[in-house]
Structure formats: C-alpha cells, structure tokens
Amino acid sequence: GLDEPLLRAVLDEAKTFGLRVTAHLGPVDALTAGEMGVSAIEHMSGVPEAAKADPKLDAAFKAGFFPGWTAFERAWAGLDSASLARVAERLVAEKVTLIPTLVLHDTFSRLDDPALAADSALRAVPDSEIVRWNVPGMVRRAGWTQEDFAALRAARANQDLFVRLYRAAG
C-alpha cells in the first residue's frame, strides 16, 4: 500500500488532471485518506486503522501484502460500534464513497470450506479462470490457518455493521 507521502503525491497529480482517486489503502487509515482527498475507498480498507489505533496493523502492512491484509481482516472483530459509527459519520462528512466488496470479505472467510467450491454461483465461471485463481496457492502464500479463517468469519458481523452505519450516516 501507499504511505502518506506517496498517497499525497498521487492525489496532487490527480488534481492536476481533475481526476478523482479511489484507493485500496494500506498504511494510511480511512479518515486520513478522506481528509487528504481520496474520493472512494475499496474493500473498507483503512477503516479498522481509523477506528482503533494499533501499531501492530502498521507493522503488518510493512511486512507485506498478505500480513497486512490478514491483520486488517482480523482487526474488524475487535472494533466497537461507537468507533465504527464515528468513522462512518466522518467518511460521509468528507463525502468519501465506500466500495465495501462484502462478497470478497465473505469469500476470504470461507476459503477453508469445501462447500464454497461447489457454490452454484461458480457455474458461470470458466474452469480455466477457477484454475487461474489457484485458491490453495493463495491460502498457502497468505499463510492462513484455521485460526485465521475463524477470525475472518468473526469479523464479518462488524463489516456488515459498518456498511449499515455508513448508509445510515448519509
């Protein structure tokens, strides 16, 4: 992910051309990104970091994509509704569009479930694409364990709650 100075440079360049910036955040939290001028946030990235300062999240992002993503997903379960509401209200006030991709969070939380591969929604996906996804390889590269999958499933309620709070805020 982009650190704050690099994100600022991207935003400055985009402003030159009248472009809006959507971001998949890493080390920059959602509120800081919104205040800087990011117009949309993918995957609700940066929300846990904005809701609760945790130096372990910053360290995880510095360690690489999968350590950062895993820490981000796991962090959702420990967030309280008041903090989530505060972040949602401020993002709405900054006019930041949220692109939650809840299906992504839900799918990641169930990659250890063999029934997921049999989901009827996958019938429309060509076999060559499913092979290209290489789910076992991704799980291996991410280093996800049964404990991680349980934590990702536990996080889902707060992710859904955040979307409801964001919508209610405006």
Language-model features: locations:
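Active-site neighborhoods of metal-dependent hydrolases
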Residues: 51-170
